[in-house]
């Protein structure tokens, strides 16, 4: 799109948001485009990010989106891990809320706040007001896997993450928040 707009004197950048809707005002941005084009929108980005430290100029047009896909693959991996551990906790008669409380207080916090957010949504059963749907995650997983193949670097763990989320969607949870993934994992064990 940037190439089509350039002859008309229109600048274009890719500036995907890195964060959930609850983080508005503190989002990070992976920015792709020219220095000149980014300078024109910097004030808007500062309002959305809250600080210059959250604005990352990744490279030319398209590179911001590439980094976003990698970021979402990491989110998907954390989601798949949370799905399995939360399903196993329930299967063994353990409290999902207690698992999250202990994991966040212990070393699982190194996984980021995503684990805490996903785990909390699971423990509270909040899936109907999605911050990011299972099907959206599948779309980004596919784009990331395709991108990796184009670079001659197939992702083994990424393919497993994609498999988990496709299984979740096939079970009818595609439009739900991705935190619902644990239910699909648990259904497979109870079958």
Region annotations inferred by a language model:
Residues 1-73:
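Rossmann-fold dinucleotide-binding core
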Residues 8, 190-191:
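Eukaryotic N-terminal targeting leaders
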Residues 63-189:
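Helical "substrate-binding/catalytic lid" subdomain
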């Amino acid at each position: 799109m940037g190439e089509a707009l350039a002859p008309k004197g229109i600048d274009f950048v890719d500036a995907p948001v890195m964060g959930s809707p609850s983080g508005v005002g503190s989002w990070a941005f992976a920015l792709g485009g020219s220095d000149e084009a980014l300078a024109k929108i910097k004030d808007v980005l500062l309002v959305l990010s809250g600080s210059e430290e959250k604005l990352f100029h990744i490279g030319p047009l398209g590179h911001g989106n590439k980094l976003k896909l990698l970021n979402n693959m990491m989110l998907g991996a954390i989601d798949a891990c949370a799905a399995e551990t939360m399903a196993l906790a329930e299967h063994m008669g353990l409290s999902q809320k207690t698992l999250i409380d202990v994991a966040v207080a212990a070393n699982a916090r190194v996984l980021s706040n995503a684990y805490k957010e996903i785990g909390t949504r699971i423990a509270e059963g909040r899936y109907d007001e999605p911050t990011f749907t299972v099907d959206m995650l599948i779309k980004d997983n596919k784009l990331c896997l395709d991108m990796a193949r184009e670079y001659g670097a197939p992702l083994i763990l990424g393919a497993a993450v994609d498999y988990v989320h496709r299984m979740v969607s096939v079970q009818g949870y595609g439009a739900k928040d991705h935190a619902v993934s644990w239910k699909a994992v648990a259904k497979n064990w109870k079958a």
